[in-house]
């Protein structure tokens, strides 16, 4: 299963990074360059004035599709997203399957004021500290990749550092884990990370399991304004969209079209 492979490789890479650059060094970097994360909850909460909130993704490749965008310029892409009115920007930092780099966060941070998500396979507090040092405002935690205890601990650590957390779910068990962990922002990924199959009716089934007051984010398979309107009608606040935008020549127009119709 691809998720297991990615987690295994992530842990191997992490061991080397921790050896090359210990956590206390990261902490020292933070002391010299303090960074206060931006308000993610306000950016992603649906409102009557702006019902459809977009998390636009900077992504070169994926395990299911390979390279998605050959002409890949992270800073330019992020600036176009911001200019088009994206409410947050997701930055892939996983290097092997997604061709990401954590340096992209720092580069993009210099040129944008929009909240940034570190999207990666986070399994250790070290990666959360990294996210803060490199300039992220929130992180992704995948419920399927973590035990309930691990998810709760990592989420608490992120909140302790001032980072918000998007907890990604795909089934009822994941949702239970997210609620138990105390997640404020819960993602529902239409894509199964084990076999890449899509289930576009997932939000309809999982949203009733969520308590009131949570910010709900729909992920994967989104490419039309009408899809977003319908999902917003049943309770989705924000939409994480990557591949659709990455395949467009005119990214700015694509964001405006999907957001405004």
UniProtKB/Swiss-Prot annotation:
Enzyme class: lyase
UniProt-listed PROSITE patterns: IGPS
Keywords recorded for this protein, A-Z: Amino-acid biosynthesis, Aromatic amino acid biosynthesis, Decarboxylase, Lyase, Tryptophan biosynthesis
UniProt xrefs under Gene3D superfamilies: Aldolase class I (3.20.20.70)
EC number: 4.1.1.48
Record pathway: Amino-acid biosynthesis; L-tryptophan biosynthesis; L-tryptophan from chorismate: step 4/5
Cross-referenced SUPFAM superfamilies: Ribulose-phoshate binding barrel
Reaction(s) the record says it catalyses: 1-(2-carboxyphenylamino)-1-deoxy-D-ribulose 5-phosphate + H(+) = (1S,2R)-1-C-(indol-3-yl)glycerol 3-phosphate + CO2 + H2O
Example GO biological process: L-tryptophan biosynthetic process
InterPro entries found in the cross-reference section: Aldolase_TIM, Indole-3-glycerol_P_synth, Indole-3-glycerol_P_synth_dom, Indole-3-GlycerolPSynthase_CS, RibuloseP-bd_barrel
Disulfide-bond pairs as recorded: none
GO MF annotation terms: indole-3-glycerol-phosphate synthase activity; phosphoribosylanthranilate isomerase activity
Family stated for the protein in its record: Belongs to the TrpC family.
UniProt-recorded name of the protein: Indole-3-glycerol phosphate synthase
């Amino acid at each position: 299963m691809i998720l297991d492979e990615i987690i295994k490789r992530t842990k191997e890479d992490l061991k080397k990074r921790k050896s090359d650059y210990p956590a206390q060094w990261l902490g020292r970097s933070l002391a010299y360059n303090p960074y206060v994360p931006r308000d993610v909850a306000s950016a992603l909460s649906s409102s009557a004035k702006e019902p459809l909130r977009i998390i636009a993704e900077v992504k070169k490749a994926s395990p299911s599709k390979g390279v998605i965008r050959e002409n890949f310029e992270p800073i330019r892409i992020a600036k176009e997203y911001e200019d088009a009115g994206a409410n947050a920007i997701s930055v892939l930092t996983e290097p092997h399957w997604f061709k990401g780099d954590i340096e992209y966060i720092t580069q993009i941070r210099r040129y944008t004021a929009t909240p940034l998500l570190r999207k990666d396979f986070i399994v250790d507090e070290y990666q959360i500290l990294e996210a803060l040092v490199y300039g992220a405002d929130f992180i992704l935690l995948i419920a399927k990749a973590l035990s309930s205890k691990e998810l709760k601990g990592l989420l608490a650590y992120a909140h302790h550092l001032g980072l918000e957390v998007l907890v990604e779910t795909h089934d009822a068990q994941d949702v239970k884990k997210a609620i138990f962990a105390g997640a404020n922002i819960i993602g529902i990924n239409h894509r199964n990370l084990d076999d890449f199959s899509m289930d576009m009716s997932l939000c309809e089934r999982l949203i009733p399991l969520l308590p009131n007051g949570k910010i709900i984010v729909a992920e994967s398979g989104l490419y039309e304004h009408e899809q977003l309107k319908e999902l917003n009608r049943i309770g989705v606040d924000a939409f994480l969209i990557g591949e659709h935008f990455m395949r467009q020549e005119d990214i700015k127009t694509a964001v405006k079209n999907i957001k405004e119709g």
